[in-house]
């Protein structure tokens, strides 16, 4: 699209945090209106600039377009953060996919620095509990769920318990040895058992089938009973101390530095479970987390893996049982185990650790237990969602002293080296291990809920905004080789990890979009949405990552889930990880497919938000309200029928991709003449009666999700070359769906010259192909067929080289 800057037209459009002033260009589908953004930012921070703006074309159609902003290197960001209050400055940006310049269509942001920091928000809405929402119908969602549940019920419980019994000196005869990352020769063992507990709890909450619940409960009860038996072996009284042996008593003083991390040492530690400290529960001895205080590195042979990561998985699993399982005896025992383990964490970190931010790394490590250094170590310092679990746990226990200690324990996982820059809006994501740090931002939001300190909310919000604008792919996933790379380099990442294929041809085969990252980004998004449920960007993103990575991350016919996802050229989904013990993504994969509905509906005292269009039945227990949502999946139309009435307002998400033909009717009458994409349409508070029906029509349309950089010759040594002229790369979208083609196997085949209105792309309708479960939308372009990503299992190409004119 060639821009023409002859005419200037000022139009004010409210778009999230920005006020838009637009340029007019009178051509058919060329840009008529683009954004100049005006924002305020507190002194000492980098501004949050929008990563999408509303664009109007000459034919008066509109859509959201992505923006890439300049000045993202560390030095430039530090300079912006240093601007004093009262300063006004401009930041240059470009709309992606446009050929007005080599970098895109120019836009500009005007930033005003203000003195006062923004106050932190208060929680507005909460998702309906998982037990109160049921998926319905015969579709890909319910098919995946049922496949997951069958797999959970097929697994050998003894394999989940073997390492615990071995670590606590209990007989292991008749117990199968686990495999994968939970095998006896890894130091991450226990993580898969925690995920298994969570998956069982979610499966239990998501069904109303009594027989299925009974089958799940048998496994849950045995797991809880045996884990408690292991934990009780740490209840060791010391006459010398006049109390039970506690976490703080393990390896005091110089003994900490004498601890070894070898397997020979760990075999000795397993014989000394009496020293672990009251309440310790893990599949590996307590010396494992203690070694982190001496800054021992990630090394499975000689030192540690990720001790607190495994502790978190077990805590999370037990808490999920306590919150979701209807058997009071089992739920109470799970909570008791979690409480005692949470208090072990408090005891150890309260008495044996501290925070010192000043000085060199050597000075900060002069004595053991500096949490600034502990939580900033690669992998060894990975803590999963410890803040989140301890915060949740503090809200479940009855004793006030226990509650206070658990809240304090959650605060011990404050990570100054990571949180500090993010609180200022500085991009400290680059170069970090993705799934080590995404859960830490989930934890920051939980700490905000506990303390009310705005900096914690700023950490979570800034992280989310940076991910959306600088790091996410069209599928919603992030990461290359488990890492955040440099900002705005997604397309370069697609051309990494050279492999030699047939005929000796070198081709890229990148490890892109770890599935655990999608799991945790969805969790962060759901939690942020509770603070601002009217900001439809949150659930637009949740829909994107759910539909285009999570749903497609399990094979629809035989159970297997992905670790890295398939986003590159002619990439195949690497299904495997058949049990939660095989890998981290085997663990999150076991959970993913039994909780699709967890963010479908949010409620406040007087309002219901319909956030996702999924075939489901739901109950709003506090109001005695119930409804049924009837639709296909994915849905171009949906009917919400009230089955038990009450008084409330209803807000329905208008997706960012909504276009012509979108409408909402209440009992047959339109509620508005027009709707704004990426917003919520409100039906004001009213008395709803059984039989009232809300009908949503949302025809899918075509658009492109562009990468922020143009793929040229790869600059990484040893990578395959792409000797092409620089072009925009983008993924073809149909409504919320990323469309990919198995007919494209080379970058030459992926190159297209298209009109900006994309009329060359022909929709074939929902009946064009039969899917594994239900009908499948397809598109046709130049003799090549495109399918939704979730439908594809083998080789396909997502990103195309595009010249729009």
Go through each PLM region and give its residues.
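C-terminal beta-rich recognition modules with glycine/proline-rich loops and embedded aromatic residues
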Residues: 460, 539-548, 553-641, 676, ...
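Hydrophobic, small-residue-rich alpha-helical packing segments that form membrane-like cores
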Residues: 336-439, 446-450
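Aromatic (Trp/Tyr) and acidic
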Residues: 11-15, 120-210, 247-274, 286-325, ...
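Serine/threonine-rich, repeat-prone extracellular segments and beta-strand-based repeat modules
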Residues: 59-112
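Solvent-exposed, low-complexity, repeat-rich "mucin-like" stalks and linkers
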Residues: 28-62
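Bacterial Sec-dependent signal peptides at the C-terminal "C-region" and cleavage site
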Residues: 8-29
């Amino acid at each position: 699209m060639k821009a023409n800057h002859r005419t200037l037209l000022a139009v004010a459009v409210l778009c999230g945090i920005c006020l838009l002033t637009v340029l007019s260009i009178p051509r058919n589908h060329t840009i008529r209106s683009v954004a100049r953004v005006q924002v305020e930012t507190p002194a000492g921070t980098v501004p949050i600039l929008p990563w999408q703006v509303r664009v109007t074309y000459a034919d008066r159609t509109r859509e959201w377009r992505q923006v890439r902003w300049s000045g993202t290197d560390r030095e430039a960001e530090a300079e912006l953060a240093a601007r004093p209050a009262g300063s006004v400055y401009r930041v240059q940006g470009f709309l992606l996919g446009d050929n007005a310049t080599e970098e895109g269509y120019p836009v500009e942001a005007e930033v005003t620095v203000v003195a006062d920091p923004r106050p932190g928000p208060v929680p507005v809405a909460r998702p309906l509990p998982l037990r109160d929402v049921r998926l319905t119908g015969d579709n890909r969602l319910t098919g995946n769920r049922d496949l997951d549940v069958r797999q959970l019920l097929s697994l050998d419980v003894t394999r989940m318990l073997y390492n615990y019994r071995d670590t606590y000196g209990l007989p292991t005869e008749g117990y199968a040895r686990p495999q994968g990352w939970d095998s006896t020769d890894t130091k991450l063992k226990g993580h898969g058992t925690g995920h298994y507990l969570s998956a069982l709890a979610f499966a239990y909450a998501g069904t109303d089938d009594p027989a299925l619940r009974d089958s799940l409960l048998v496994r849950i009860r045995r797991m809880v009973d045996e884990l408690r038996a292991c934990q009780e072996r740490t209840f060791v009284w010391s006459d010398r101390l006049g109390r039970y042996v506690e976490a703080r008593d393990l390896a005091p003083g110089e003994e900490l530095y004498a601890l070894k991390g070898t397997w020979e040492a760990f075999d000795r530690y397993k014989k000394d479970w009496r020293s672990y400290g009251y309440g310790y529960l893990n599949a590996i001895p307590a010396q494992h987390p203690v070694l982190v205080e001496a800054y021992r590195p990630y090394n499975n042979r000689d030192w540690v893996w990720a001790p607190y990561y495994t502790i978190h998985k077990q805590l999370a699993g037990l808490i999920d049982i306590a919150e979701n399982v209807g058997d009071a005896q089992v739920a109470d025992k799970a909570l008791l185990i979690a409480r005692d383990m949470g208090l072990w964490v408090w005891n150890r970190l309260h008495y044996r650790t501290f925070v010192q931010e000043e000085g060199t790394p050597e000075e900060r490590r002069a004595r053991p237990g500096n949490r600034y250094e502990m939580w900033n170590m690669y992998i060894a310092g990975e803590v999963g969602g410890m803040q989140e679990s301890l915060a949740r746990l503090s809200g479940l226990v009855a004793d006030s002293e226990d509650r206070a200690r658990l809240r304090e324990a959650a605060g011990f996982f404050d990570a100054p080296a990571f949180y500090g820059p993010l609180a200022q809006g500085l991009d400290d994501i680059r170069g970090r291990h993705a799934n080590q740090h995404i859960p830490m931002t989930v934890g920051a939001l939980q700490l905000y809920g506990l303390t009310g300190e705005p900096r914690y909310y700023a950490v979570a919000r800034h992280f989310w905004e940076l991910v959306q604008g600088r790091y996410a792919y069209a599928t919603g996933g992030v990461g290359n080789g488990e890492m955040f790379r440099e900002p705005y380099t997604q397309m370069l990442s697609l051309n990494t990890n050279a492999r030699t294929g047939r005929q000796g041809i070198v081709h890229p085969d990148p490890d892109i979009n770890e599935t655990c990252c999608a799991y945790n980004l969805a969790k962060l998004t759901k939690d942020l949405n509770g603070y601002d449920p009217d900001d439809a960007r949150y659930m637009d993103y949740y829909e994107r990552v759910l539909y285009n990575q999570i749903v497609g991350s399990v094979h629809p016919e035989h159970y297997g889930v992905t670790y890295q996802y398939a986003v590159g050229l002619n990439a195949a989904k690497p299904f495997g990880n058949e049990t939660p013990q095989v890998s981290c993504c085997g663990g999150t994969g076991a959970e993913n497919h039994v909780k699709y509905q967890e963010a479908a509906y949010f409620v406040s005292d007087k309002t219901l938000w319909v956030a996702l269009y999924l075939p489901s039945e739901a109950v709003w227990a506090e109001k005695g309200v119930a409804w049924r949502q009837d639709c296909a999946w994915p849905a171009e139309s949906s009917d919400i029928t009230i089955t038990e009435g009450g008084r409330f307002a209803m807000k329905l998400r208008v997706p960012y991709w909504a276009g012509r033909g979108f409408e909402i009717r209440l009992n047959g009458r339109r509620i508005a003449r027009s709707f704004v994409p990426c917003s919520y349409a409100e039906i004001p508070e009213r008395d709803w009666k059984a039989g009232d029906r809300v009908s949503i029509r949302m025809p899918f349309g075509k658009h492109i999700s562009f990468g922020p950089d143009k793929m040229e010759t790869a600059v990484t040594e040893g990578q395959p070359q792409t000797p092409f002229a620089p072009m925009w790369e983008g993924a073809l979208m149909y409504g919320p769906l990323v469309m990919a083609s198995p007919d494209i196997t080379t970058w030459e085949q992926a190159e297209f010259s298209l009109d900006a209105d994309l009329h060359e792309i022909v929709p074939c309708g929902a009946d064009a192909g039969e899917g594994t479960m239900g009908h499948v939308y397809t598109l046709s372009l130049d003799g090549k067929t495109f399918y939704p990503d979730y439908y594809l299992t083998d080789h396909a190409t997502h990103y195309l080289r595009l010249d729009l004119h």
